[in-house]
Amino acid sequence: RHAVAEITSELQVRNGEGIQEDGSFHQHGRQLQLGNYGLGFLQSMSYWNRILAGTPLAFPPERTEALRHLVLNGYRWVIWNGRFDLLAQGRQIGRNSQTGKAKAALRAIAALQKADPESGRLYAEILRQKTPFTGNRHFFNSDYMVHRRPSWYASVRMNSTRTVPVEDRINWENALGRYFSDGVMLIMRSGDEYRDITACWDWTRLPGTTLPATPILTEQECRELKIKEASGKTPRWTLSRHWRKTGESEFTGGVSDGTRGAAV
C-alpha cells in the first residue's frame, strides 16, 4: 500500500516537473517532454493502473483523473496517423522515432482504457487513428500549438523566458537541434513527411524559422581550429546551447478558441 501511494503521488497536475495544466508534460525544467520522459511516465502509470484496477489497491479516482487529463488533453493531440509529432518528442528524434513513440503511447492508452472504462469511448477514438478529430490547442505551459483538420496536421514549437528550449547534444541525441524549438512549424498529411528526415535537414534552415547561417563544425574541425568551450574542452558540435536554460524572448505565446488559433 505504501508503494502504491508513492507511485500515485506523481499523478497530479503541478507547476513543477510532471503533468501540466494544459495537458503537456515537463521534465528537465519547464521543457516539453511528451515523447521522452512523459512517454515513460505514461507507460508506467498506465501499466500499474491496469494491474491494480478492481483491487483494494486501485488508483484513487483523482489520480486516474490526472492520467486521463494527460492523455485526453495531451497525447490525444500529438499523434497523427500513427506518427508522433517530432516537435513534442523531446531530444529523441532519431530513426523511426515517430512511429515507435506513437505505438508505445497507443499501447499505454489501450492499457488505460481497460482500467478506466468511464472514458473508454474517447480512448477508443484515439486508438482507431482512422477518423482524426479536429481542433486547435495551445499548450500555454509549453509554448506549443497544435492545429488539426480532417486531412492535415500542423504544429508550432516555440520557447520563451517561461520555458526551456528543446535540449540538444545530450547522450548524442538531437546533436544539431539547437534551433528545433525556435518557431519551427511542421505540417503533416500522410504522416510520412518527416520520416527519418533528421539526418538530411539543414539545421540552420528549419521550416517556419528565420535563423542565422551558423556554421556547424564537427569535433575534429573544432580541434583543428582550436575552438574551445568555456570549460576548456573541445565541443562535439558547435551548434549547441546549454540545456535547461530558459529562452530569451517574452514576446512568445498563443491564443485558441478550440477551433482556430494563432501563435507567435
Language model features with spans:
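Active-site lining segments of carbohydrate-active enzymes
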Residues: R1-A58
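Extended polysaccharide-engagement surfaces of secreted carbohydrate-active enzymes
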Residues: F41, W48-V264
